[in-house]
Structure formats: structure tokens, C-alpha cells
């Protein structure tokens, strides 16, 4: 399944979450596209709930189904809870860390920064959004990209940086100082549904 590249607000309304992180998509019309008003939806089956939860998380991080499933399988080989490990692995993606540092306003924009070669890891350019960032690695904006307008605009509006990352706005560098705890990740996601979905 290819990555969705259409309007994110449509997916946000269908899934009931804000993919942009601003919540603006749901302010005016907090119901699915195609509905003529906030009417009650049909009762969803258990399978439907599980699938919807999977779609929420997949679209949140902007992954294809194949990327999502591969990461899920990788998480299953680690010690601990499968669902939590899965969410932590998603959080360790380079494009997500760039987003968490405030260098991009959305994960989609962060993925473009990485793809276009604006980001380095430990001083070496990395243009693979799925690159897994390890604790202690230094993420920086390339010197040639320091005046990138998209980065500057994002830094002007970004204020919240999670405790598990550190960021130096003057040097445009940051790092993953520890793995996040489950309580620090998306509270609106029930990862148990996703584990159940793939366990069928």
C-alpha cells in the first residue's frame, strides 16, 4: 500500500485525530468527511475498532502499510511489551525526531527535510526518514541548510520539546537523551488493538 499523499485534514476527520498536531482540522467539523453533520455513526465491530486504531497510528507517523508492519514485526523481537516497543520504535525514526525537535511543523515536513539532505546524524548526512536514532546520537541541521525558511518558520511556532530529547536552538542540534516512556507517547492510541489486529 502506497503512502497517502492527499489532504491530511480528510484523514484526520475520518480517523478523529489531528495529524498536523494543531487540532484545527477537527475544530469546525469534528466528524468524518461525507457526513452531513455530527450524526451518530454505525456501531463498529471489534475488527473495525482494531483496524481503525492501526490506521490512526500509521497515518500519524506517515508510513506505508509495509513499513508499518515491518516495524511491528521488529518490535515483536524485543524484550518487553510488544505494543509499547512498537510505539517506541516509531518514535525513534529520524523524521519523527526531527519533528519532535521542532525543526518541522509536521512529520510530513520533517520527512521532506530528511529526504532532501538537510539533516545529519553524528555529523554525517542521512537522507533515510526511517533511520532509527539511538540514544545519544546528535541530530543537526546541515550548515548549508541553516537558513532554510521552513525550518526557521517552524522554530518560531514550536515551543514544546519532549523531555526525552534535548535541543539547542542556536546550534540547531539536538539528541535523543533517553527512550520515551509509554506515558509520554500518544495517549489517544490503544496499541493493544493493533497487536490484536496483527495477531489474527
Swiss-Prot record:
| InterPro entries linked | Ribosomal_uS4, Ribosomal_uS4_bac-type, Ribosomal_uS4_CS, Ribosomal_uS4_N, S4_RNA-bd, S4_RNA-bd_sf
Keyword Cytoplasm assigned to the entry: answer is: no
Molecular function GO terms recorded: rRNA binding; structural constituent of ribosome
A Pfam family matched in the record: S4
Keyword list, A-Z:
Ribonucleoprotein, Ribosomal protein, RNA-binding, rRNA-binding
Note whether tRNA processing occurs among the keywords: no
Q: Per the record, what is one GO cellular component?
A: small ribosomal subunit
Describe its assembly: Part of the 30S ribosomal subunit. Contacts protein S5. The interaction surface between S4 and S5 is involved in control of translational fidelity.
Q: What is the role of this chain? A: One of the primary rRNA binding proteins, it binds directly to 16S rRNA where it nucleates assembly of the body of the 30S subunit.
Q: What is this protein called?
A: Small ribosomal subunit protein uS4
What gene, per UniProt, encodes this protein? rpsD
Amino acid at each position: 500500500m502506497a503512502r497517502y499523499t492527499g489532504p491530511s485534514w480528510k484523514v484526520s476527520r475520518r480517523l478523529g485525530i489531528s495529524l498536523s498536531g494543531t487540532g484545527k482540522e477537527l475544530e469546525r467539523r469534528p466528524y468524518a468527511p461525507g457526513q452531513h453533520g455530527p450524526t451518530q455513526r454505525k456501531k463498529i465491530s471489534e475488527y473495525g475498532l482494531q483496524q481503525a486504531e492501526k490506521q490512526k497510528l500509521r497515518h500519524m507517523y506517515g508510513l506505508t502499510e509495509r513499513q508499518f508492519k515491518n516495524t511491528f514485526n521488529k518490535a515483536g523481537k524485543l524484550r518487553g511489551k510488544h505494543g509499547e516497543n512498537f510505539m517506541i520504535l516509531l518514535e525513534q525514526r529520524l523524521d519523527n525526531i526531527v519533528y519532535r525537535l521542532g525543526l518541522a511543523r509536521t512529520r510530513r515536513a520533517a520527512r521532506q527535510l530528511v529526504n532532501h539532505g538537510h539533516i545529519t546524524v553524528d555529523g554525517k548526512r542521512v537522507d533515510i526518514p526511517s533511520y532509527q536514532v539511538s540514544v545519544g546520537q546528535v541530530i543537526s541541521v546541515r550548515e548549508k541548510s541553516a537558513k532554510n525558511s521552513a525550518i526557521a518558520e517552524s522554530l518560531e511556532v514550536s515551543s514544546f520539546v519532549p523531555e526525552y530529547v534535548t535541543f539547542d536552538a542556536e546550534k540547531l542540534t539536538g539528541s535523543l537523551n533517553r527512550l520515551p516512556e509509554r506515558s509520554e507517547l500518544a495517549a489517544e492510541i490503544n496499541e493493544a488493538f493493533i497487536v490484536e489486529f496483527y495477531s489474527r
